[in-house]
Amino acid sequence: MVRRTLLQAALRAWVIQCWWRSMQAKMLEQRRRLALRLYTCQEWAVVKVQAQVRMWQARRRFLQARQAACIIQSHWRWHASQTRGLIRGHYEVRASRLELDIEILMT
């Protein structure tokens, strides 16, 4: 009788231990998934901020190049109207610089 009671108690203890280990594993997995989700969210936010900054920088460079091209163009037009020469030109705006080829034919 005592032996049976001890076996039942040991079996119940073993069942409780198995349940507790499985609960600990589930809680650990939940914490791991939450940490992964938070990391992914932060990583996505960083990528978005970097993209916005790069877009802003590219736009600023483009606007500066366009403004420089407009100033050069207006000055050359004024010069052409004063000299009555023929101006042929070609310009190309790139990400970091402005390429300008101008040919002036005097009459």
Swiss-Prot record:
Molecular function as annotated in GO: calmodulin binding
Disulfide bonds: none
InterPro entries, per database record: IQ_motif_EF-hand-BS, IQCF
The keyword Repeat is assigned to this record: yes
Domain IQ: 42-71
UniProt keywords, alphabetically: Repeat
Stated name of the protein: IQ domain-containing protein F6
